[in-house]
Amino acid sequence: MNGKTIILANPRGFCAGVDRAISIVERALEEFGAPVYVRHEVVHNKFVVDNLREKGAVFIEDLAEVPPGATLVYSAHGVSKAVQQEAAERGFRVFDATCPLVTKVHKEVARLDAQDCEIIMIGHKGHAEVEGTMGQLAPGKMLLVETVGDVAKLEVRNPDKLAYVSQTTLSVDETKDIIAALNARFPNIRNPHKEDICYATTNRQTAVKELAEQCDIVIVVGSPNSSNSNRLREVAASRGIDAYMVDNASYLQRTWFEGKSKVGVTAGASAPEVLVREVLATIRGWGHETVREGGGAEESIVFVLPKELRREGETKPDLCKR
């Protein structure tokens, strides 16, 4: 043995929301046959999307591309009220694969709006989840904040009737800084009853921080358009080590590992384990022979499928436990 080691982060890869979203598309294809139309990539991973496309899924952005009476699935990121209304008017058979933790944020937005609160959204402009959440209200009713610097530029109607929500896949540390800035500028701003950043995002970022303390380099398996995968790479890099994100093993470069004795490997919440295994095989082939699993939070959450797609014996759990 040469002492060169690969340490696998735990937890890593698929979260409950991603697992549910993929299963909804697969079950819809089994029940109703191809094509099944999916509004936006169901999750942000090229391997997953290509695999579903081969099975008969058709990924679209505009509902005008969907024929009357077709089966339509909303992506895990959620959709706006306008998209929901158009789908209803056109009579599609709709299955909502929105992550339940994103749906929780949508419900919070509706509750706050009913109380006449102006709402600030912490998130990345253009991300599908942000568009879906901000689209729960009429255009212009929510304010978007991406950085601490944006907080100083905010113009609000009434600082005493103000609240915020956030995208579920953000950097935990950066979001804390933005929240601190919001609370400093608007002391009466309402905070969510429960943090909006999801358990999977938090757990994976915590695990990669621990990984970065033990390793000389961290590899994150994830697609370029995956928000949570990008945040994992950034978190690792912020610890002062080399960190790279790869869609699959073919993107690895042997020179990255020269002089590195300990390699950390993790995967974004939308990246399947098969891609992790391919990355491991490649790195092992370059001389890092030992592989061990890191410790970390155990995840046992399972999100139920829509009742129309459940099989016999699949029941709705009373509670989703971590």
UniProtKB/Swiss-Prot annotation:
Domain of life: Bacteria
Catalytic residues (positions): E129 (proton donor)
Keyword vocabulary terms for this entry: 4Fe-4S, Iron, Iron-sulfur, Isoprene biosynthesis, Metal-binding, Oxidoreductase
Entry EC number(s): 1.17.7.4
Residues that bind (2E)-4-hydroxy-3-methylbut-2-enyl diphosphate: H44, H77, H127, T168, S226, S227, N228, S270
Single biological process term from Gene Ontology: terpenoid biosynthetic process
Annotated isopentenyl diphosphate binding sites: H44, H77, H127, S226, S227, N228, S270
CDD domains registered for this protein in UniProt: lytB_ispH
Pathway(s): Isoprenoid biosynthesis; dimethylallyl diphosphate biosynthesis; dimethylallyl diphosphate from (2E)-4-hydroxy-3-methylbutenyl diphosphate: step 1/1; Isoprenoid biosynthesis; isopentenyl diphosphate biosynthesis via DXP pathway; isopentenyl diphosphate from 1-deoxy-D-xylulose 5-phosphate: step 6/6
Cofactor: record remark: Binds 1 [4Fe-4S] cluster per subunit.
Reactions listed under catalytic activity: isopentenyl diphosphate + 2 oxidized [2Fe-2S]-[ferredoxin] + H2O = (2E)-4-hydroxy-3-methylbut-2-enyl diphosphate + 2 reduced [2Fe-2S]-[ferredoxin] + 2 H(+); dimethylallyl diphosphate + 2 oxidized [2Fe-2S]-[ferredoxin] + H2O = (2E)-4-hydroxy-3-methylbut-2-enyl diphosphate + 2 reduced [2Fe-2S]-[ferredoxin] + 2 H(+)
UniProt-annotated binding residues for [4Fe-4S] cluster: C15, C99, C198
One GO molecular-function entry: metal ion binding
Residues binding dimethylallyl diphosphate: H44, H77, H127, S226, S227, N228, S270
Chain's role: Catalyzes the conversion of 1-hydroxy-2-methyl-2-(E)-butenyl 4-diphosphate (HMBPP) into a mixture of isopentenyl diphosphate (IPP) and dimethylallyl diphosphate (DMAPP). Acts in the terminal step of the DOXP/MEP pathway for isoprenoid precursor biosynthesis.
Identification of the protein by name: 4-hydroxy-3-methylbut-2-enyl diphosphate reductase
Organism: Neisseria gonorrhoeae (strain ATCC 700825 / FA 1090)
Gene name per UniProt: ispH
